[in-house]
Swiss-Prot record:
Its main location: membrane. This is Tetraspanin-32. Expressed exclusively in hematopoietic tissues. Expression detected in spleen, thymus, bone marrow and peripheral blood leukocytes but not in heart, brain, lung, liver, kidney or testis. CDD domains: PHEMX_like_LEL (cd03153). It is found in: Membrane.
Length: 256
């Protein structure tokens, strides 16, 4: 396979990869917005705590996710334009965006590996605090906040390790509400669903980012060295030259 064929294949591959990266960035931004502004996480974040541990994690995840989605989309756009226009400067900028995205993704993966339950613990601690305060003073605003949380997660109270509702929680879980799931388990199920989606997006982003960086590096060197790519220039017609009694046909030459 010649050098020109390899470059043509690399161009097609990077265009396809950039399209997938754009879709991935859009999916990531959508997931971040849903998590940040969704009802399940908003009611937990707005709990009346002096220092809500989950609220900090929620804003951190939002800004990191939006920044990552923006970098991925920008890298895909720059490298696509660079591929079409054969601009090594734009290709280098696209490679830089992918490299920054890769660094962020690695940090997120390490954080997820070493702190697998940090978000879950923060959410459950917030619910436990609201629940305990509501049980201590049923006539306070804590009871209303607890009711909003339980209506959002479609759950009621929390069960003891033996599978029974605690005595104070049995008061509020009567009638149709008694058929609802334990709130601790319901919260875990919601978090696990979002964890699964986030893990899939993270792993896919890592794979596509590494592949995009490899293609960007290859095409940058190809464009920079002008090997196999069409040289851009203009053609002009030279006047006929006489060599003795022989005449030469007009010829074309390229100059850059």
């Amino acid at each position: 396979m010649g050098h020109w064929n390899r470059i043509k294949i690399a161009k097609c591959q990077i265009l396809i990869t950039n399209f997938l990266v754009l879709l991935l960035g859009l999916s990531m931004a959508t997931m971040v917005v849903v998590i940040h502004f969704g009802d399940h996480f908003t009611v937990i974040g707005h709990a009346s705590l002096e220092r809500n541990p989950y609220e900090t994690l929620r804003y951190w995840a939002f800004y990191v996710g939006i920044s990552l989605a923006g970098l991925l989309s920008l890298g895909a756009a720059l490298s696509t334009i660079a591929t079409v226009r054969e601009a090594h400067g734009l290709m280098a900028a696209g490679f830089l965006c992918f490299a920054l995205s890769f660094c962020i993704l690695v940090q997120v993966a390490f954080w997820r590996f070493y702190n697998p339950t940090q978000v879950e613990d923060a959410v459950l601690d917030t619910y436990d605090f609201v629940y305990d305060q509501a049980m201590k003073s049923p006539s306070s605003n804590w009871w209303q906040e607890l009711a909003v949380i339980q209506d959002t997660f479609l759950c009621c109270g929390k069960k003891s390790p033996f599978g029974l509702l605690v005595s104070t929680g049995a008061i509020m879980c009567q009638g149709r509400e008694a058929m609802r799931e334990d709130c601790l388990q319901s919260i875990r199920n919601v978090l696990w669903t979002h964890y699964s989606i986030a893990s899939i997006l993270t792993c896919t982003s890592l794979a596509l980012t590494v592949y995009a960086m490899m293609l960007c590096a290859f095409l940058w060197f190809a464009i920079h060295s002008y090997h196999g790519l069409d040289r851009k220039g203009r053609y002009s017609l030279t006047p006929p030259r006489s060599h003795g009694f022989q005449t030469q046909e007009p010829s074309l030459f390229r100059w850059t």
